[in-house]
Regions:
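Beta-strand-rich N-terminal accessory domains
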Residues: 1-63, 69-78, 87
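Short acidic/polar mixed-charge low-complexity motifs
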Residues: 19-22, 41-42, 82, 124-126, ...
Length: 219
């Protein structure tokens, strides 16, 4: 297991178990995981052309959403005068992250702390830490959010994986909850009704599992 620089120009590092199992991530572009290869298969979709244009948001990989997911339905900051409105999905995905690598424990740790930049939008002192453990056939995340302020800190947190799926016929939900949150009306809805409108967004209310079966096994 080792950590090495994969693409110096783009600031991408690779965290590798072996040649068939690794992840790539970019600390300076929101700590985003750009690629996850498991047993030789690319699990994530990633738009490399868009990534090279730093004026555009990243499409693909696993962006980190903090301190909100989605948009706030307001034209001004919820924290009052003197603060900028929080951007869509928050600011974490646009900032440079710190990282460390624990070879003995076999995990990568990503850090984001409050700064002058974050306090333009969000008047709180915080530390966000994400431990990423790479295993054969799995990628595990442990998220710790530490409120260092003296008052309550409202947060949303999300991981936004883009899965590399070629055919929806091979998708299967396991233990899918009956109900979900309708994002447009902020009401409880039937999950299958909402999945038929999945392009509009759906929040499942309990844990679920999405399985994808490759139509052609790897040689």
């Amino acid at each position: 297991m080792k950590l090495e620089l994969s693409n110096k120009a783009q600031g991408i590092f690779v965290f590798r178990l072996d040649k068939n199992n690794y992840i790539k991530f970019c600390p300076e572009r929101g700590g985003v995981i750009t690629n996850w290869v498991s047993d030789g298969n690319e699990i994530l979709y990633f738009d490399e052309t868009r990534f090279m244009d730093k004026t555009k948001s990243i499409r693909g990989g696993i962006p980190i959403l903090f301190p909100i997911c989605g948009n706030l339905n307001t034209s001004s900051s919820v924290f009052g005068n003197g603060y900028l409105q929080l951007p869509q999905h928050g600011f974490a995905r646009d900032l440079q992250w710190q990282y460390s690598f624990n070879e003995n424990e076999r995990f990568l740790c990503l850090f984001l702390n409050a700064s002058k930049q974050t306090k333009k939008y969000y008047p709180f002192d915080f530390e966000l830490k994400i431990e990423v453990t790479l295993k054969i056939n799995s990628l595990e995340f442990e998220i710790t959010i530490n409120n260092k302020s003296y008052f309550a800190m409202p947060i949303n947190f999300g991981l936004h994986p883009y899965f590399n799926v070629s055919d929806f016929k091979n998708l299967e939900f396991v233990d899918n909850p009956l109900n979900c949150q309708n994002q447009e009306r902020n009401t409880i809805s039937n999950t299958w009704d909402e999945l038929n409108k999945i392009n509009l967004g759906v929040d499942l209310l309990t844990y679920t599992c999405l399985l994808y079966t490759s139509p052609s096994p790897r040689d």
